[in-house]
């Protein structure tokens, strides 16, 4: 009997003797190819470069990794996220396109799509240049001015006020869940996905940094896990609005 272990756990196996060809076929299912290994190495190096602030070199590493293994969604996600943070929105749009045709669309790429939509709106629509006070005046006159509320949420998002953006989105969802093909709900779900803390590796403590690379600071920093607590709070608010 042959049992294949991964991280100390059995994942596959076979009984009796098998020909060399069958053995290679068995191993090929579980052993990453050369391109996969190179892509994983480049991804690790790129993440370290991003942590150190060397974004251009990180971008080059991620491009190299994606060329080596175009099917690696982790690399594609990190590259799109990095391009957005560097303001290279057209390049980010190009890199994300292959993932947008996936059925079903993976939530993290839907999240990046919503982020991109907001940034494109702010950079191309005249309302994207309005001061917040102008939105507030319109909303004070008509609390159901959802166009103004949604535009304000996108402006807040583009200026890195993610909680402010979600508060505005909740105001729309509370009054009309279906407005604009549920764009406020989709946007908020995307933001929550990007803000959800990264799963720890080999530990129980969160880093305070999200899977989308978003890091929020505030009065809740005294709590054990402010990022996760904040995300959970907004998830509950959204759930209450939808039920």
Each predicted region: which residue ranges?
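A conserved position within tetratricopeptide repeats
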Residues: 31, 66, 93, 100-101, ...
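Alpha-helical segment of the N-proximal tetratricopeptide repeat
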Residues: 38-68, 121, 126, 130-138, ...
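Inward-facing hydrophobic residues that define packing positions of alpha-helical scaffold repeats
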Residues: 62, 96-97, 135, 168-169, ...
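A short, hydrophobic beta-strand/beta-hairpin element that forms part of a small beta-sheet core
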Residues: 1-14
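Alpha-helical linker/edge segments of TPR/alpha-solenoid repeat scaffolds
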Residues: 86-94, 107-133, 190-243
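Short coil turns that delineate tetratricopeptide repeat
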Residues: 70, 103-104, 142-144, 160, ...
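Structural register within alpha-helical repeat arrays
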Residues: 45, 79, 113, 152, ...
């Amino acid at each position: 009997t042959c049992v294949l272990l991964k991280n100390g756990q059995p994942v596959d196996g076979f009984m009796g003797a098998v020909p060399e060809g069958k053995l290679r076929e068995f191993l090929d299912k579980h052993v990453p190819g050369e391109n996969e290994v190179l892509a994983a190495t480049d991804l690790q190096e790129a993440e370290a470069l991003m942590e150190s602030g060397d974004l251009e070199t990180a971008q080059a590493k991620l491009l190299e990794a994606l060329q080596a293994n175009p099917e690696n969604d982790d690399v594609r996600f990190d590259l799109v996220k990095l391009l957005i943070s560097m303001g290279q929105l057209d390049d980010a749009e190009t890199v994300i396109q292959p993932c947008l045709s996936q059925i079903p669309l993976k939530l993290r790429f839907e999240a990046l799509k919503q982020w991109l939509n907001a940034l494109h709106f702010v950079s191309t629509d005249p309302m994207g240049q309005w001061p917040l006070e102008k939105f507030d005046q319109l909303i004070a006159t008509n609390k159901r001015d959802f166009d103004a509320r949604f535009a304000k949420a996108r402006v807040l998002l583009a200026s890195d006020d993610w909680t402010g953006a979600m508060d505005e989105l909740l105001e729309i969802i509370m009054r009309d869940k279906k407005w604009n093909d549920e764009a406020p709900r989709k946007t908020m779900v995307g933001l929550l996905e990007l803000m959800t803390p990264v799963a720890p590796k080999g530990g129980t403590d969160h880093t305070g940094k999200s899977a989308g690379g978003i890091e929020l600071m505030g009065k809740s920093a005294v709590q054990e896990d402010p990022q996760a607590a904040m995300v959970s709070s907004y998830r509950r608010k959204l759930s209450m609005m939808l039920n």
